[in-house]
């Protein structure tokens, strides 16, 4: 058996190959020495997670409620929603053909809308569609399983149970949803809460009702009939589900007295991200396979997300495929055989010009995210068009001001599978009864938050306010809004 060998002297041969191209790549007064590390110091700080106090409303299914953002901390870094999902039991007296499960992406779809407000004026918002898109294109594979566990994609919740079976655990199941507001993207854009003493800051939630989140099916209803059944209490459930404890947690940074004194001394502009969702529109491949949808966004758009949602079951919010999920015993297949992307190709038009002409869905689902997103979605039907070289980067790397464009429209050409499934002729379970669809498009845009305080450290709290630039629909005077 031979012995492996090497010696230090041979390395000098490599060093001796230094020539003209190496002069271009190596050396000089600004060259980095990789073997003498320079410490990059930071200011002194600590982090503290705290629950936020309830402000208005009742945190329950189908309700609107809010929490107040505390100013006890200096910078708000991240927030997340923690919910206890109750155990649900399907009525044991029902026929064995019935099954019950929670919708996929439960924590996403619990949120009809979430907003952050300054003195009741909305600074940022998102909905369940943005949560679906954002997680699909930004959560890396190394965190995907953990994220699925946090938002409810676990077998005890999304796998169907027969009559007498229980969804969830005794005492409920605790789920967590990271809230993707602009300040959570990076510590450099954290919200300086200590510099905003005269702003009433709130996070507001609009929750869906439990009837919109539970999926009841009856396999005795065979094609062409839909297997989905509206839930009735006490016929299907003996009691209506009630949420357990609901909390919003915030992670704050506490800084030194010196840094705190400087926070409000000068005007500070923060480049933030906002979300716009166009009104959903019916998508009917049988009658119009190439519909044209007007999209009216504004500001510097850095990315467009779009999909055709399968709404055959009103409670299946995160299905963007041609087929409905298929239940077999105690399992569910969310992408059954014969399930495809409802969109074959897409045309983007503005200024009477084809910005993108009949680009195949593989471009929006694979190629564009491969180059411009942190990850490629693992499920069918998610589409991205990024104006930015890397839309997840906070720095400006490309955008288009939709406020300056006219007659913007998108034409999603239906795939043959969508046409067949719409008529119930898909040929496989899940598409052998008529499927219905709607078109969803979401934009991420940049905007600027201006935070301004007093002129001196002694009175920096006296004049703090937040200004949102270029938000014309919120304007009080001209192109800006001021939150005093």
From Swiss-Prot:
GO cellular component: viral capsid
Pfam families: Capsid_N, Capsid_NCLDV
Keyword DNA repair: no
GO molecular function term, any single one: structural molecule activity
Sequence similarity: Belongs to the NCLDV major capsid protein family.
Subunit structure comment from the entry: Homotrimer.
Name of the featured protein: Major capsid protein
Organism in which the protein naturally occurs: Wiseana iridescent virus
């Amino acid at each position: 058996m031979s012995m492996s060998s090497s010696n230090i002297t041979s390395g000098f041969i490599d060093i001796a190959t230094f020539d003209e191209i190496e002069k271009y790549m190596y050396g000089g007064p600004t060259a980095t020495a990789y073997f003498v590390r320079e410490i990059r110091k930071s200011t002194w700080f600590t982090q503290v997670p705290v629950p936020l106090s309830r402000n208005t409303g009742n945190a329950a299914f189908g309700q609107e409620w809010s929490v107040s953002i505390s100013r006890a901390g200096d910078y708000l870094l991240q927030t997340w929603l923690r919910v206890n999902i109750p155990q649900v039991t399907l009525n044991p007296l029902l026929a064995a053909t019935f099954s019950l499960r929670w919708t996929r992406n439960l924590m996403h779809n619990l949120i009809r809308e979430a907003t952050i407000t300054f003195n009741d004026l909305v600074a940022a918002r998102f909905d369940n569609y943005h949560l679906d898109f954002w997680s699909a294109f930004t959560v890396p594979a190394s965190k995907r399983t953990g994220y699925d566990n946090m938002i409810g994609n676990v077998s005890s919740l999304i796998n169907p149970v027969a009559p007498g079976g229980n969804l969830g655990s005794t005492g409920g199941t605790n789920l967590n949803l990271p809230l993707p507001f602009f300040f959570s993207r990076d510590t450099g854009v954290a919200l300086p809460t200590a510099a905003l003493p005269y702003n009433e800051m709130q996070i507001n939630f609009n929750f869906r009702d439990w009837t919109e989140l539970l999926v009841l099916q009856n396999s005795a209803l065979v094609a062409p009939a839909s297997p989905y059944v509206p839930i009735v209490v006490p016929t299907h459930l003996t009691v209506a589900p009630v949420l357990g404890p609901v909390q919003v947690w915030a992670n704050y940074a506490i800084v030194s007295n010196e840094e705190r004194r400087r926070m409000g001394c000068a005007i500070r502009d923060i480049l933030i991200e906002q979300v716009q969702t166009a009104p959903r529109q019916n998508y009917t491949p049988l009658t119009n396979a190439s519909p044209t949808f007007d999209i009216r966004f504004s500001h510097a758009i850095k990315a467009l997300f779009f999909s055709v949602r399968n709404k055959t079951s009103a409670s299946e919010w995160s299905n963007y495929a041609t087929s409905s999920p298929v239940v077999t015993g105690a399992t569910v297949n969310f992408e059954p055989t014969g399930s495809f992307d409802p969109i074959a190709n897409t045309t983007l038009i503005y200024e009477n010009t084809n910005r993108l002409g009949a680009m195949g869905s593989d471009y929006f689902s694979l190629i564009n995210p491969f180059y411009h997103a942190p990850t490629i979605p693992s499920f069918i039907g998610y589409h991205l068009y990024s104006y930015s070289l890397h839309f997840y980067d906070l720095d400006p790397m490309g955008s288009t001001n939709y406020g300056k464009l006219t007659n913007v429209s998108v034409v999603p050409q239906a795939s043959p599978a969508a046409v067949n499934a719409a008529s119930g002729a898909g040929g496989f379970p899940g598409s052998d009864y008529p499927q219905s669809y709607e078109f969803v498009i979401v934009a991420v845009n940049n905007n600027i938050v201006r935070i301004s305080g007093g002129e001196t450290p002694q009175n920096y709290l006296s004049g703090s306010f937040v200004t949102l630039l270029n938000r014309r629909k919120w304007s009080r005077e001209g192109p800006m809004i001021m939150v005093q």
